[in-house]
UniProtKB/Swiss-Prot annotation:
Protein name, as recorded: 2,3-bisphosphoglycerate-dependent phosphoglycerate mutase
Molecular function GO labels: phosphoglycerate mutase activity
Family label: Belongs to the phosphoglycerate mutase family. BPG-dependent PGAM subfamily.
Pathway given in the UniProt record: Carbohydrate degradation; glycolysis; pyruvate from D-glyceraldehyde 3-phosphate: step 3/5
Reactions accelerated catalytically: (2R)-2-phosphoglycerate = (2R)-3-phosphoglycerate
Enzyme kind, highest EC tier: isomerase
Lineage, highest ranks first: Bacteria, Bacillati, Bacillota, Bacilli, Lactobacillales
List of residues binding substrate: 8-15, 21-22, 60, 87-90, 98, 114-115, 183-184
Active site per the UniProt annotation: H9 (tele-phosphohistidine intermediate), E87 (proton donor/acceptor)
InterPro entries associated with the record: His_Pase_superF_clade-1, His_PPase_superfam, Phosphogly_mut1
Any Gene Ontology biological process: glycolytic process
HAMAP family, alphabetized: PGAM_GpmA
Physiological role: Catalyzes the interconversion of 2-phosphoglycerate and 3-phosphoglycerate.
EC nos: 5.4.2.11
Amino acid sequence: MVKLVFARHGESEWNKANLFTGWADVDLSEEGTQQAIDAGKLIKEADIKFDLAFTSVLTRAIKTTNLALEYSDQLWVPVEKSWRLNERHYGGLTGKNKAEAAEKFGDEQVHIWRRSYDVLPPAMAKDDPYSAHTDRRYANLDDTVIPDAENLKVTLERALPYWEDKIAPALKDGKNVFVGAHGNSIRALVKHIKQLSDDDIMGVEIPNFPPLVFEFDENLNVTAEYYLGK
């Protein structure tokens, strides 16, 4: 029986300020740092031993991964970073206050942008200060691959190859895996793992804490799903 632990990053400074974050590289808040530490402690209490870990290329997820591994006494575990585990790209909403966006565009429209499976938010301008096109961490990517906006459908389409190439093979090899990622990249993978419908995934929320655990048999059928400490 192998285990996959999903840890959404702890609260970020922009979570705290109620801003759309997406691919903007925002740090953890003080509360978020503590959540990551507490995640590690829960993992240690549950005696889950990892063989490898995966995270995005965004600071808040990287720090959460490192802290969770450190406080579960597993900081030595190999960690691979990939842009494919990044948060969903919120396009032109990035950096905007969620309440102010609702006032400007209407509650219903903002809700559709946030929760629908296949509706895109407004695209980010190429010269936007938060544009990934000029960010060095994406220098090895073809410019056409870098998104200017994503919905959950597109997020799953770019995360799924990483699942199939890296994460699923590790689980099939009997390895326990830690994934430190983001609310929507985790939601996308949960949709695939549980084969949820487009409508059902709309009601799924991934909290900053505690970590979500899946247990699988040798054929990657889910045998258990639970949040640590609950």
